[in-house]
Amino acid sequence: MSKLTNVVIFIVFFLGMMAKETQGQHICHQILLNNNCDGATCTSLCDKQLQGTGQCYKTVDKRFICLCNYLCRT
């Protein structure tokens, strides 16, 4: 019984620490290239400008845009 109690307390403590680390981290999005997106260029540009990850996406009107996802700065 004592071991089970210790394990439960450890798990609750661990989950509390994980929640504290992720709290307040919001993902922001920004379009960097509005047309003719190239995968390598998009990734590189997003990394250099915003320290994020960029991917090309096809829009409804069939354009390819570079969407950069990065941690918001406060």
UniProtKB/Swiss-Prot annotation:
GO terms for biological process: defense response to fungus; killing of cells of another organism. InterPro entries: DEFL. It is found in: Secreted. Keywords: Antimicrobial, Disulfide bond, Fungicide, Plant defense, Secreted, Signal. Residues 1-24 form the signal peptide. GO terms for cellular component: extracellular region. Disulfide bonds join 28-72, 37-56, 42-66, 46-68. Belongs to the DEFL family. This is Putative defensin-like protein 128.
